[in-house]
Amino acid sequence: MGEVGVWPILFSDKDKGRCQRKNGAKTLACEKKSVILHLETYRIMDINPSEIGPKFIDLQRILEQKRVKAPRWVVRMLERLLHIEEINSGIYLNRELSGIDFARAFVEGKEPQNLGIELKLQGLDNIPREGNPMVVGNHPLGGPDGLALMDAVGRVRSDIKFPVNDFLLYLPGLRELFYPIDKVNRSKALATLEEAFASPNTLLYYPAGLCSRLQNGQVRDLEWKATFIKKAVRYQRDIVPAYTDARNRMRFYRLARLRQRLGIKFNFEMALLPAEMYAQRGKAFGITFGKPIPWQTFDKRHTAAEWAQRVKDHVYRLKDNPDATFEP
């Protein structure tokens, strides 16, 4: 879910100046109600459901706090583009829920504020009920697929954690499931990732980082980084491969291709992801969980990068053969 980082930071540097240290150097307690700023990473850590109103994400206020002057018509245009009203309605409807319960309600709930997606799950028995497995999969959608993965794995394990862009902490119902990755501070991001891999939790992980793109006529992930292989070996985590059978609309892929042809590095097609999320409303997609791959498999026969590519290829084989065995 790393690419759903289109949401602006809610608090400006000016806000930090009005805060005081609490508990030594670990946190800053701010005057704003129920908000704690964790030094360099902004985290909403203690929001009571009663404090969540119908307009929880207030784009106008966010822009003002960031000292961005924008005409009202521009704000309205951004609100429509980012589907702020719909996201707020989902947050408000499910404000009493948290963790896996929030993810399941938002993904499968039939209320108009939710997505009402029908999940078709295969291989849930392949998720170990004990130990510290790492569920690794493709990332076709950039949002609802991650929520659906939490929903699905949460039927077997209650201890799931997901490393995500720290902006996603502004979805209060999900924050307890996240390891927030600070995209600005690389050293802090690496430390948080290390903490996630070292934890005893069931870890959900998208090795591509970004959601899938159209490549040679097929929707596939970009390169899978080898980090998950190295950490699986270091922390003795068996890998559960997971294939999600879904895709965004063609306009997302066309915009991504146009950006690439123009030589633009910034992935501005990300701004379409909220619309793509709601385009999944009422649809069905499947998630297939393959047989666990023991961490001891990843030996010196191949480099970590080669192992990562082999696991990626195996994940895509699950589409046609859910019972496929990983071939080293």
Stretches with model-predicted labels:
Residues 2-5, 17, 24:
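Residue-identity detector for glycine
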Residues 154, 158-198:
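Conserved nucleotide-cofactor-binding alpha/beta core module
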Residues 9, 14, 36-38, 43, ...:
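Short, positively charged and aromatic/hydrophobic N-terminal segments
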Residues 42-133, 146-148, 155-157, 168, ...:
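Membrane-anchoring hydrophobic helices of lipid-metabolizing enzymes
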Residues 117, 183-187, 221-222:
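A conditional alpha-helix N-cap/helix-loop micro-motif detector
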Residues 190-328:
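Non-catalytic C-terminal accessory region of glycerolipid acyltransferases
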Residues 25-29, 41:
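Ala/Thr-enriched low-complexity intrinsically disordered regions
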